[in-house]
Amino acid sequence: MEIIIHDLPEEKLKNMCKSTDNSLIISDDKKIKNCMGCFYCWTKNPGECRIKDGYDNLAELYSKAEKIIIISRCCYGSYSPFIKNILDRSIPYLLPFFKIKNKEMHHTIRYKRSFYFDVYFYGKNISDEEKEIAKSMIKANCINLNVANFNISFLENFN
């Protein structure tokens, strides 16, 4: 399965790519709630978010993905608020335990799978500093999410 997570207007995405039976598109429908940091997904019902807003099954979806594509406006070298919220709500994909990877502390993975991670940042005048911050963040995301391989692209416009 391929998951496309984006913050584009729906019409713009429809004009750019075709959905298939093997793809799932996650877009900002204004219904997502912020992670409460309650750790229900780790302690009470492992792998499942307590907030029932349609985004409570992200960990399960990630576990079935072969490829995750993120299309996000670049905000100071990071994701847009919607994309950041999706990634925050994906924490049930990980376990509440830690291990050392590359001399850094990271969560252990819940699912013994990996996927390809393709990230497209768009925006006018993305600075070199913002690009470096974004690259560093994506590399850390990839370690945390047990990503097999990844690509990062920076685009002036996403048409």
Regions found by a protein language model. Give the residues of each.
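Short, conserved loop/helix-junction motifs that constitute active-site signature segments
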Residues: T108-F115
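Short hydrophobic beta-strand segments
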Residues: M1-I5, Y116-N125
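Short histidine/acidic/glycine/proline-rich micro-motifs that form metal-
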Residues: C74-Y76, G123-D128
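Glycine-rich anion-binding loop/nest that anchors nucleotide
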Residues: I70-S72, L94-F98, N102, F121-G123
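A generic local structural motif
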Residues: G54-N57, K103-H107
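N-terminal beta1-alpha1-beta2 submodule of the flavodoxin-like/Rossmannoid cofactor-binding fold
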Residues: M1-I68, C74-L95, I143, F154
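Glycine-rich phosphate/pyrophosphate-binding loop and the adjoining helix
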Residues: M1, N125-N159
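Short, acidic/small-residue loops that bind anionic groups at enzyme active sites
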Residues: S90-M105, N146-N151
